[in-house]
C-alpha cells in the first residue's frame, strides 16, 4: 500500500480525546475492560450515555464508544498496562478523567499479540506504540530467554533464563505475548500477573514516566533483547534489507527444538496457536495484506472460530480453529458471492466517505494511487499487479470475445467443415479444447481424471485404498530426501507427492511419482495426519538414516498446486537441500523457490518482475505458486514431475518444440488444459512411458506420441525448472509466423496474442531481465514511454521487495530450421540474444565470511569465476550468486584480465568494510547452430538442438571439468605440492608428417574415451611447420580407454598431438577450453592430429601436467549415469608399454580396514565433488590407526568408503560415512605419488580452507 493511502486510512486519524466528569457520588460511568494480563489493550466496556459526553474546553465533544481502545488516561500511556494499573490511574483522578481513545480496525484491535507481531518503520506511530506497550509490560514482567546468563546479568531481573523445553511449554500455554529468535536463542515477553504482586499497583510517582512525551523510560533491557526487538522493524525504501540483523519475530512451539544458531527470515508466524503453522508459500512472494484495510472493515466479522493473524511483515492470513488449518484467503470473500469483473462498475471517482474504499473493485483487489507513478491495481488473491483497471480490462476482453464470436458465427455457414486435424498440426489453433475424456484409461488403476465435483475420496484405512501400493526406502542425505509434499491442509485430505528434486535421493531411487499418496512412514500410518505432523516426522529422521515409505498410486492430486486460481496449499519441501532454521524449526528449501540454491544448474537467475507488459498484459506470467518452502529461497532447483495424459480424439492436447539450449523437447503450448492437467508450458520432456527421449530428435518424439492409440494413457516424466529460455526479440516474430508452416515446432503459439494466453499459465515467474525495450500496447503512456513496473513500486513501498527465483518460460518456439534462417538473415543483429547477462550483487559479510570461493586468474587474461558457494553462507542466503559466474567488478574495480591475487586483496578490503558489491556475468544457455562452414567458437554451447545436455556437466566450473584428475587451475603456481615432474615430450615432428582428421562418434551412454595431456609448466618442443611458422603443440593424447570409441576407431595413438578440435585451432587455448570444446561437441568430435613422437610417451603422465579424461557421458537421465573415472588404465600401445615394477603395479589398488582409536582413525581427507576433485588422503596422524596399518600414504586416492563408491561424492558425505560407520571403517584406495592436489581457488569463509577430518 502506498504511503498516501496508508496515511488516509491509518488509525492515528481516528484517535480522539474525551473528558468525562465524575458524578455526585464520584462515579465515572465508564467501564474499563481488557488489560495486558489478558493479552489485550485496555478498552471501553459499558458507557453510561449521560456520563460519556466529551467536554474538551468546556464544550461538547466526541463521546467514548463501547469497544474503543484506550491509548492514554489523563496523559498516561496505558497501552500494555494490566487493567488494575489502568484503574489505578483512573482512581487517582478526582473530578474529571481525560481519555484518548481510538476505534478498532484491521491493523489495530484489542489483541496485543496481534499488534506486537507486526513490523513497522522505525519512528512511525505504530513502532512508537509497540515500544510503549513493551515498556509498560516490563514494569510487571521480566522477559525470558533460552540463552545462558552473561556476566553481570541477574536472573529474574534482567531475564528469566529457561531451558528450551520450559520456554516452549510457556509459549504453548499462551503466556507469552511476544516471541522470537535472535542469534539462535528464543526470547519472549510474558503477560503481567493476573493480580498485582503484593497488592501493589503503579504508584503516583511512577506515573510521570508514562506521561505522553516524557523523556523518562523504564529500566533498559540488555542489548540482545533490544536487538531482537529492533530486528522486527521494517526498513524504509532507501534502507538496505541487511542493515539490521535477521530475526524471527514469532515461531511455532511444536515446530521443532533444533538448536541451530543460524537464522533465516521467517515466513509466517502463528498467532495464539502453537499447533498451527501459517500458510506457507514461496518465500519470494512477500506481499502485504491480501485485502486492503478498507475491504477488511467492510466485510463484517469473521466466521466462528476463525482468527485473523499477521506475519512479521504485516501480511494477513487466517486461522481456522475448527479444522486447525491456515489460509491466505479471507473466508468472508470465499463465502461471499463475488461479482464478476465485467459486471462491476468503473471505480474511478467512487469512494466511501470515511475509508476511501473503492466500492466496485471485487474483493481482493486494491487500487494504489502513487504520487509518482500514478494509479495501478493489485490482485492479492491471484497475486498480480497491473496498471489497467481490471474492471475495464474485463469489459474490453468480453467485448472483444463477443465480436469474435459474432464474426465466427457469420462466417460459419459460408465455410466448409474443416477436416479433423492431426494432433501436431496448425489446425489446433481453431479447435476448441475438448472436455476431459469420459473413457477410462487403459490401465487397471483408478481413473486419474480429477473428480468433476464433490470432495475427493479420502480414507484413514489403508485397506480401503484401491491403487497400486509401492514400497521404497530412502536414505536422508545432508540435504534431505529430495521430494516435495502437498496436501494435509484439510482434516480429510491425503498427503501426496508433488514433485521430485533432480538428483535427489527420491529421483535417484526412481520409484516415486507425482500424485503418490503417502500411506505410512516407518510403519506409522499417516493417513489423516496434518501436513505439519508428517513434515515433523521427516525432519526428525537424522541425516544418514533411512526411511521406509509406503505409497499408493492411483489417486491424482485433487488440485493443481501450480494453478493460481486454486487456494494456496501449505507444503514443505522434503528435498535435497541444506536444512535451514525457520522459527526454530529445521526445514528445507523449495525446489520451486530456489531454481537450485547450490547452483546445480548454473545458469539459473533470480527473477524479478519485468516490464508492466509482463506483469499485466501477458497472463502467461504471474507469481510462483509452488507453495513448497518455509524460508527464503534463492533459486529454483529442477523438479521431476510425472504427468499422466489420456490421448483423446484430437490428440494429447499439447504441442512441443526443440529446447533452445538443447536437451530435448519442451512443451510449447497447452491446447487442451483439462486433458493436460499437471503439464505446464516450458516443461522439458524427459521420459515417455518410462523411455528416455532426451536424445531423440523432434520428429522421433512426435512419431512416438502419434503411435499411441487413441484412448491410451501415456506417462510423461517432465523436468520443470532449470535453464531459462530467453525471449525472442519482437523483430523475430514475423519471421516465426512466416516460417511456422514448414517448421518442426508443431506449435501454435505464434497465433496467440499477449492478451489471450490461458490464465492457467500465470504461475510462471517473471524473468529478471526484461526483453527488448518494447512495451505492451496497453502499458504505454501517450508519449510511448514505458511505465515502470507497478509491482516493483508497490513492493518497494511496502519495504518487502526481494528477488524471485526464475521458472522456465515456455520454449521460444524456434525450430532448428527457423534458427538457421534467422541467423542467416539480415536482421540477425537485431534479434541476436546476448551471450551474457550481467548483474550487480551486494552482500553483507557474515561471521563466517562472504561464503564463496574465487577460481581462475592464474594466467594473464584468464577469467575469474565464482567457485563453491558455502551452504547457509552470506552468498547462499542472498541467493543471486551462482557457481560459475564470471567476476567482472569488485566494489567498482574491474577485475577482467586481472590476477587472482588482486581479487583476493579486493575481497580482503571488502571484508574489513563488512560488505562487498560484486558485478558478475552469467552465460545465457541459448546457442544457435553455426553456418555450415563457420568455425565453432570454444565458448559456444551444444551445437545440436537435438543433443541431450548432461546436467552433470553443469556442476563443473568454467575453467575446468569434473573430469580433471589433479587440478583445474592454470599455471605452475597452482600446482605447488604436486611435484615438478619429468621432461615433457621433446620429440620434433618432422616436416613430412601431414595432419589428418580423426572423427570419433560415441554412443548415448558412453564417453569418447581418450585423455588429453596439456603441458603448462614448461614450453613444449614438439613443433610443426605451417606457413613457415613454428607453432608449439602443447596438447596431446595421454591415454586411450580400452573399448572406448577412441579405441575402436583405431586412428588415435598415445602421444599424438592435437592441432584442432572441430575445426577450431587449440594451440593457444587453455586446457579447460579444450575440455569444454569437446564436451560441447555432442556425440561426434573431429580432431586434427599430428602423429606424435613415441619417445616422449613415457613422460606423458608427469605430475606437472594437467590431465583430463574426455569421457563425458551425455546421459539422457541424470539418475545413475556417472562420468568415467580417470583411473582407467590406458590400452598399451603396440609400440609402447608402461615398464613400471611389477610389485608397484600389484599395489596400485588396495583395501584397508581401520579400527577407531582414542582420537579417531588417524587420517584426514581433502577433496570432494564441491571442490571439483576426487578424495585424497591429506594427512596421517602420528601413531594413529591409519599410520600403524602401514599401507596408507599421503596422496592416496580413496575410491570406496564402507563399500560406497566415492565417485562424485561430496566431502561432507565422506565424513558422514566414516562417522556413521561405527568403530570400523573399510577403505578401498589407489596408490598415489605422495602429493595431494591443491584446490583451484581461494576461500572466503572463516573455516579451514581444506576441511580435513580426523574422525
UniProtKB/Swiss-Prot annotation:
Gene3D superfamilies: 2.20.70.10, 2.30.42.10, Guanylate Kinase phosphate binding domain. Residues 434-444 have a biased composition (Pro residues). The keyword Cytoplasm applies. It is found in: Cell junction, Tight junction; Cytoplasm; Membrane. Residues 208-227, 235-265, 395-462, 585-622, 719-820, 932-984, 1111-1142 are annotated as: Disordered. Keywords: ATP-binding, Cell junction, Cytoplasm, Membrane, Nucleotide-binding, Phosphoprotein, Repeat, Tight junction. Residues 974-984 have a biased composition (Gly residues). Residues 96-287 form the Guanylate kinase-like domain. Residues 402-414, 741-755 have a biased composition (Low complexity). The modification Phosphoserine is found at residues 357, 729, 740, 799, 1070. GO terms for molecular function: alpha-actinin binding; ATP binding. Residues 300-333, 359-392 form the WW domain. It is a peripheral membrane protein. Its main location: other. Residues 17-105, 471-553, 642-720, 840-922, 997-1093, 1151-1233 form the PDZ domain. InterPro entries: GK/Ca_channel_bsu (IPR008145), Guanylate_kin-like_dom (IPR008144), Guanylate_kinase_CS (IPR020590), P-loop_NTPase (IPR027417), PDZ (IPR001478), PDZ_sf (IPR036034), WW_dom (IPR001202), WW_dom_sf (IPR036020). Residues 585-601, 938-950, 958-967, 1111-1129 have a biased composition (Polar residues). One of its GO terms (biological process) is endothelial cell morphogenesis. Part of a complex composed of AMOTL2, MAGI1 and CDH5, within the complex AMOTL2 acts as a scaffold protein for the interaction of MAGI1 with CDH5. The complex is required for coupling actin fibers to cell junctions in endothelial cells. Interacts through its WW 2 domain with SYNPO and through its PDZ 5 domain with ACTN4. Interacts with cytoplasmic domain of ADGRB1. Interacts via its WW domains with DRPLA. Interacts with ESAM, LRP2 and CXADR. May interact with CTNNB1. Interacts through its PDZ 1 domain with NET1. Interacts with ASIC3 and AMOT. Interacts with FCHSD2. Plays a role in coupling actin fibers to cell junctions in endothelial cells, via its interaction with AMOTL2 and CDH5. May regulate acid-induced ASIC3 currents by modulating its expression at the cell surface. This is Membrane-associated guanylate kinase, WW and PDZ domain-containing protein 1. It comes from Rattus norvegicus. The lineage of its organism: Eukaryota, Metazoa, Chordata, Craniata, Vertebrata.
Amino acid at each position: 500500500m502506498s504511503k498516501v493511502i496508508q496515511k488516509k486510512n491509518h488509525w492515528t486519524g481516528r484517535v480522539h480525546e474525551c473528558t468525562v466528569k465524575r458524578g455526585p457520588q464520584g462515579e465515572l460511568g465508564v467501564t474499563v475492560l481488557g488489560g495486558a494480563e489478558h493479552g489485550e489493550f485496555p478498552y471501553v466496556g459499558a458507557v453510561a450515555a449521560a456520563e460519556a459526553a466529551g467536554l474538551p474546553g468546556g464544550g461538547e465533544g466526541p463521546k467514548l464508544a463501547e469497544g474503543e481502545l484506550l491509548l492514554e488516561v489523563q496523559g498516561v500511556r496505558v497501552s500494555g498496562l494490566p487493567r488494575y494499573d489502568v484503574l489505578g490511574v483512573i482512581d487517582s483522578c478526582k473530578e474529571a478523567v481525560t481519555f484518548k481513545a481510538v476505534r478498532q480496525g484491521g491493523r489495530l484491535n484489542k489483541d496485543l499479540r496481534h499488534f506486537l507481531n507486526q513490523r513497522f518503520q522505525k519512528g512511525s506511530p505504530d513502532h512508537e506504540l509497540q515500544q510503549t506497550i513493551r515498556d509498560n509490560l516490563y514494569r510487571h514482567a521480566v522477559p525470558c530467554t533460552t540463552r545462558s546468563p552473561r556476566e553481570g546479568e541477574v536472573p529474574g531481573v534482567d531475564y528469566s533464563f529457561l531451558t528450551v523445553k520450559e520456554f516452549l511449554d510457556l509459549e504453548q500455554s499462551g503466556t507469552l505475548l511476544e516471541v522470537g529468535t535472535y542469534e539462535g536463542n528464543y526470547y519472549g515477553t510474558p503477560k503481567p500477573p493476573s493480580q498485582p504482586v503484593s497488592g501493589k499497583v503503579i504508584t503516583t510517582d511512577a506515573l510521570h514516566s508514562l506521561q505522553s512525551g516524557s523523556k523518562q523510560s523504564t529500566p533498559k533491557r540488555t542489548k540482545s533483547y533490544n536487538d531482537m526487538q529492533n530486528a522486527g522493524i521494517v526498513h524504509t525504501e532507501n534502507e538496505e534489507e541487511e542493515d539490521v540483523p535477521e530475526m524471527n519475530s514469532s515461531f511455532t512451539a511444536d515446530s521443532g527444538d533444533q538448536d541451530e544458531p543460524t537464522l533465516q527470515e521467517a515466513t509466517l508466524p502463528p498467532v495464539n496457536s502453537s499447533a498451527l503453522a501459517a500458510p506457507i508459500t514461496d518465500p519470494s512472494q512477500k506481499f502485504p495484506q491480501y485485502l486492503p484495510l478498507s475491504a477488511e472493515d467492510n466485510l463484517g466479522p469473521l466466521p466462528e472460530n476463525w482468527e485473523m493473524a499477521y506475519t512479521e511483515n504485516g501480511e494477513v492470513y487466517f486461522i481456522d480453529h475448527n479444522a486447525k488449518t491456515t489460509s491466505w484467503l479471507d473466508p468472508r470473500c470465499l463465502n461471499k458471492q463475488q461479482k464478476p469483473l465485467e459486471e462491476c462498475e468503473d471505480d474511478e471517482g467512487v469512494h466511501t466517505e470515511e475509508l476511501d474504499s473503492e466500492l466496485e473493485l471485487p474483493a481482493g483487489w486494491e487500487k494504489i494511487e502513487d504520487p509518482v507513478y500514478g494509479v495501478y491495481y493489485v490482485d492479492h488473491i491471484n497475486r498480480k499487479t497491473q496498471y489497467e483497471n481490471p474492471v475495464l480490462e474485463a469489459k474490453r476482453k468480453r467485448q472483444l470475445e463477443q465480436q469474435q464470436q459474432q464474426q465466427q458465427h457469420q462466417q460459419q455457414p459460408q465455410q466448409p467443415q474443416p477436416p479433423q486435424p492431426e494432433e501436431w498440426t496448425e489446425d489446433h489453433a481453431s479447435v476448441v479444447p475438448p472436455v476431459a475424456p469420459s473413457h477410462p484409461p487403459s490401465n487397471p488403476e483408478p481413473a486419474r481424471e480429477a473428480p468433476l465435483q464433490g470432495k475427493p475420496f479420502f480414507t484413514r484405512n489403508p485397506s480401503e485404498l484401491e491403487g497400486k501400493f509401492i514400497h521404497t526406502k530412502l536414505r536422508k542425505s545432508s540435504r534431505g530426501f529430495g521430494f516435495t509434499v502437498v496436501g494435509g491442509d484439510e482434516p480429510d485430505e491425503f498427503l501426496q507427492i508433488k514433485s521430485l528434486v533432480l538428483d535427489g535421493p527420491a529421483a535417484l531411487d526412481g520409484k516415486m511419482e507425482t500424485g503418490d499418496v503417502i500411506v505410512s512412514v516407518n510403519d506409522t500410518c499417516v493417513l489423516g495426519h496434518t501436513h505439519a505432523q508428517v513434515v515433523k516426522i521427516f525432519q526428525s529422521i537424522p541425516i544418514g538414516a533411512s526411511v521406509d515409505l509406503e505409497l499408493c498410486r492411483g489417486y491424482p492430486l485433487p488440485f493443481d498446486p501450480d494453478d493460481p486460481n486454486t487456494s494456496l496449499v501449505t507444503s514443505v519441501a522434503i528435498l535435497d537441500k541444506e536444512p535451514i532454521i525457520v522459527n526454530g524449526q529445521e526445514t528445507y528449501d523449495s525446489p520451486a523457490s530456489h531454481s537450485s540454491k547450490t547452483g546445480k544448474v548454473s545458469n539459473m537467475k533470480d527473477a524479478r518482475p519485468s516490464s508492466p507488459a509482463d506483469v499485466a498484459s501477458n497472463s502467461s506470467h504471474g507469481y510462483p505458486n509452488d507453495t513448497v518452502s518455509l524460508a527464503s529461497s534463492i533459486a529454483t532447483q529442477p523438479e521431476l514431475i510425472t504427468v499422466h495424459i489420456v490421448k483423446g480424439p484430437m490428440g494429447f492436447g499439447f504441442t512441443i518444440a526443440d529446447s533452445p539450449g538443447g536437451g530435448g523437447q519442451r512443451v510449447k503450448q497447452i491446447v487442451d488444459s483439462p486433458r493436460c492437467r499437471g503439464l505446464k508450458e516450458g516443461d522439458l520432456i524427459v521420459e515417455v512411458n518410462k523411455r528416455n527421449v532426451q536424445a531423440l530428435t523432434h520428429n522421433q518424439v512426435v512419431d512416438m506420441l502419434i503411435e499411441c492409440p487413441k484412448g491410451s494413457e501415456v506417462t510423461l516424466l517432465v523436468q520443470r525448472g532449470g535453464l531459462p529460455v530467453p525471449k525472442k526479440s519482437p523483430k523475430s516474430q514475423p519471421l516465426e509466423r512466416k516460417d511456422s508452416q514448414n517448421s518442426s515446432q508443431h506449435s501454435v503459439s505464434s497465433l496467440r496474442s499477449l492478451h489471450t494466453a490461458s490464465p492457467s499459465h500465470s504461475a510462471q515467474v517473471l524473468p529478471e531481465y526484461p526483453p527488448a525495450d518494447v512495451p505492451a500496447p496497453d502499458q504505454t503512456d501517450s508519449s510511448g514511454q514505458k511505465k515502470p513496473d507497478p509491482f516493483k513500486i508497490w513492493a518497494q513501498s511496502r519495504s518487502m521487495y526481494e528477488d524471485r527465483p526464475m521458472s522456465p518460460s515456455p520454449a521460444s518456439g524456434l525450430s532448428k530450421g527457423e534458427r538457421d534462417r534467422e541467423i542467416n538473415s539480415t536482421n540477425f543483429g537485431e534479434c541476436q540474444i546476448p551471450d551474457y547477462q550481467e548483474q550487480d550483487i551486494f552482500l553483507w559479510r557474515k561471521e563466517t565470511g562472504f561464503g564463496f570461493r574465487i577460481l581462475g586468474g592464474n594466467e594473464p587474461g584468464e577469467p575469474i569465476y565464482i567457485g563453491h558457494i558455502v551452504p547457509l553462507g552470506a552468498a547462499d542466503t542472498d541467493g543471486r550468486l551462482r557457481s560459475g559466474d564470471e567476476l567482472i567488478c569488485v566494489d567498482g574495480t574491474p577485475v577482467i584480465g586481472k590476477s587472482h591475487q588482486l581479487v583476493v586483496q579486493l575481497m580482503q578490503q571488502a571484508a574489513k568494510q563488512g560488505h562487498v558489491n560484486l558485478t558478475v556475468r552469467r552465460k545465457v544457455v541459448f546457442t544457435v547452430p553455426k553456418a555450415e562452414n563457420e568455425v565453432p567458437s570454444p565458448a559456444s554451447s551444444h551445437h545440436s538442438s537435438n543433443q541431450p545436455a548432461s546436467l552433470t556437466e553443469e556442476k563443473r566450473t568454467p575453467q575446468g571439468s569434473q573430469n580433471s584428475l589433479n587440478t583445474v587451475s592454470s599455471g605452475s603456481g597452482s600446482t605447488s605440492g604436486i611435484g615438478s615432474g619429468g621432461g615433457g615430450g621433446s620429440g620434433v615432428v618432422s616436416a613430412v608428417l601431414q595432419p589428418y582428421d580423426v572423427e570419433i562418434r560415441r554412443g548415448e551412454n558412453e564417453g569418447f574415451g581418450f585423455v588429453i595431456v596439456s603441458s603448462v609448466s614448461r614450453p613444449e618442443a614438439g613443433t610443426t611447420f605451417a606457413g613457415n611458422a613454428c607453432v608449439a603443440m602443447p596438447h596431446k593424447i595421454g591415454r586411450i580407454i580400452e573399448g572406448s570409441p577412441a579405441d575402436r576407431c583405431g586412428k588415435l595413438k598415445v602421444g599424438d598431438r592435437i592441432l584442432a578440435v572441430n575445426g577450431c585451432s587449440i594451440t593457444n587455448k587453455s586446457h579447460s577450453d579444450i575440455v569444454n570444446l569437446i564436451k560441447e561437441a555432442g556425440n561426434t568430435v573431429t580432431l586434427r592430429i599430428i602423429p606424435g613422437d613415441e619417445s616422449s610417451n613415457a613422460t606423458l603422465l608427469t605430475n606437472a601436467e594437467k590431465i583430463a579424461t574426455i569421457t563425458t557421458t551425455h546421459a539422457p537421465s541424470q539418475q545413475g549415469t556417472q562420468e568415467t573415472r580417470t583411473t582407467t588404465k590406458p590400452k598399451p600401445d603396440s609400440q609402447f608399454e608402461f615398464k613400471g615394477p611389477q610389485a608397484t603395479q600389484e599395489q596400485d589398488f588396495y583395501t584397508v580396514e581401520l579400527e577407531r582409536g582414542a582420537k579417531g582413525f588417524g587420517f584426514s581427507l581433502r577433496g570432494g565433488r564441491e571442490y571439483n576433485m576426487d578424495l585424497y588422503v591429506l594427512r596421517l596422524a602420528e601413531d594413529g590407526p591409519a599410520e600403524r596399518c602401514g599401507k596408507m600414504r599421503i596422496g592416496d586416492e580413496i575410491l570406496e568408503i564402507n563399500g560406497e563408491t566415492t565417485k562424485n561424492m561430496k566431502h561432507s558425505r565422506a565424513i558422514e560415512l566414516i562417522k556413521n560407520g561405527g568403530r570400523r571403517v573399510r577403505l578401498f584406495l589407489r596408490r598415489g605419488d605422495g602429493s595431494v592436489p591443491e584446490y583451484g581457488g581461494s576461500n572466503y569463509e572463516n573455516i579451514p580452507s581444506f576441511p580435513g577430518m580426523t574422525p
